Structures are given as structure tokens and as C-alpha cells.
Regions:
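N-terminal targeting leaders characterized by basic, low-complexity, disordered sequences
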Residues: 1-18
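Serine-dependent protease modules
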Residues: 2-5, 22-245
Length: 245
């Protein structure tokens, strides 16, 4: 008895290997998508070399994102113009920190340890605003026991931050820290109040250190954040970032 010879199954390459033109069937089509704006097309070439074009309509959205004023983004947008970056140069080296305007005439609150070396040795203190302008600042006053200092720049019409009541802050309240960690100005981090009345020693040297009862937060704070504001959900200042764990 003679059985008909079975036709061997065609051997196909795995999907990840390119097919040669000789092995491509006439019905196969290579497609390249071309998308532009709200309308576009699909351009391709079939096995015979003829071009094909199928038009497609794409829907684009022109709506803008509406953010609540008390959202993190909304609060940061209001606070950022009032926050500055601080760079110091002194005989012992340089440093960076943050600060914020406490009135419209150029008065800035920061940490004493940010500018203490420059203040002691007659060094230079430069302040960079959120809009990119740079000013030389002078020290109006400083208090090592509270790790606070006030600077002044020759500018006016500036946006100052409002102060809140840190005594009314509760553990678990949301907070936002803004400053220039690692020299990265305009950095925003969020967290909560983790604890109150934490005993903290702040400062760079033993003769100008301070022992304060501080608010503890889990918001990311790094070198360069010192002197920047810690604000509540309304954008009011409830603390000054002075130390990191």
C-alpha cells in the first residue's frame, strides 16, 4: 500500500527574528505609524512595494488640570516665590542653605549656622531668588541660641510668607518643606509631623550651637535645606528646617 506523502509544515522563524522578503507572503504588510497632532495616518508598504495610507483621527485634550489651592502643588506654587537659596564664602570655605522672605522689603529669615562662618570672618553671602536674580546680602542680626539669623537684600516688592501657630500643630498634620537640598533650589518635599518638642542641638560649632525643642517631620530634609520654611497645608510657616537625622 502506498500512502500519500505528507507535505512538511513550513518552517517559520521566531517572531523576534526579521522575516526576509522572499519568505513574506503577499498579504503581509509592514506598517509604520505616523502620528501628528489631532489627525494622522498609518503609512505602510505591502509585499508588492505599493504604498498604502490609512487616515486616522486622534482626539487631543485641551483641558487644563485644576488643582485645589490647598493641595501640595497649589501650596508649593504660592510658597516657592518667597523661598531663596543662600551661598556663603569665607576664609574657612563655603556653604549653602535656604531662607525665606519675612517682609516685602528684602528681609530674609534663615538659620544662624548657614551664615555664621561668613558673618564671623567677613565673608560674602549671596542670595538667589526663585526668579533667578542674585543679590549680595548683609546680616541684620543673628541669635545662635535659637539658630536664627536675619539677612537683608536691596530689593522691594517681594512676596513674604505668613507665620502660623506651631503650638496648634498636631502629630500627623501634613507639612511641606521647601529649600535647596544639595544645592538643588526650589525642591519641595512632603511629610507629616512625626513628633513635637524633640530636643535638638543645631549648629556647626560648639561655641555657636543651640539646644531647641523642635518639631520632628518625616519630610525629606538634606544639607542645603537648612533655613528653609516648613509650612502647613495653608502655606503658613510653622518651623524653620534646622537639622537632619
Amino acid at each position: 500500500m502506498i500512502f500519500p506523502r505528507k507535505k512538511p509544515a513550513p518552517v517559520t522563524a521566531p517572531w523576534w527574528q526579521a522575516q526576509t522578503r522572499a519568505k513574506s507572503s503577499k498579504g503581509s504588510v509592514a506598517l509604520i505609524a505616523v502620528l501628528a497632532g489631532a489627525a494622522g495616518g498609518i503609512l505602510g508598504v505591502n509585499a508588492s512595494g505599493a504604498s498604502i495610507f490609512n487616515r486616522v483621527n486622534l482626539v487631543s485634550s485641551t483641558s487644563t488640570i485644576q488643582r485645589a489651592p490647598d493641595s501640595v502643588a497649589g501650596t508649593a506654587q504660592r510658597v516657592l516665590p518667597s523661598v531663596v537659596s543662600i551661598q556663603t564664602r569665607s576664609l574657612t570655605g563655603g556653604g549653602t542653605g535656604s531662607g525665606f522672605f519675612i517682609d516685602s522689603d528684602g528681609y530674609i529669615l534663615t538659620n544662624n549656622h548657614v551664615i555664621s562662618s561668613a558673618a564671623q570672618t567677613g565673608g560674602r553671602i549671596q542670595v538667589k531668588l526663585n526668579d533667578g536674580r542674585i543679590f549680595t546680602a548683609k546680616v541684620v542680626g543673628r541669635d545662635a541660641s535659637y539658630d536664627l539669623a536675619v539677612l537683608k537684600i536691596a530689593a522691594s516688592g517681594l512676596k513674604a510668607l505668613q507665620f502660623g501657630d506651631s503650638d496648634q500643630v498636631a502629630v500627623g498634620d501634613s507639612v511641606i518643606a521647601i529649600g535647596s537640598p544639595l544645592g538643588l533650589s526650589g525642591t519641595v518635599t512632603t511629610g507629616i509631623i512625626s513628633a513635637k518638642n524633640r530636643p535638638v542641638t543645631a549648629g556647626d560649632s560648639s561655641n555657636e550651637s543651640s539646644f531647641i525643642n523642635a518639631l520632628q517631620t518625616d519630610a525629606a530634609i538634606n544639607p542645603g535645606n537648612s533655613g528653609g520654611p516648613l509650612v502647613d497645608s495653608t502655606g503658613s510657616v510653622i518651623g524653620v528646617n534646622s537639622a537632619i537625622a
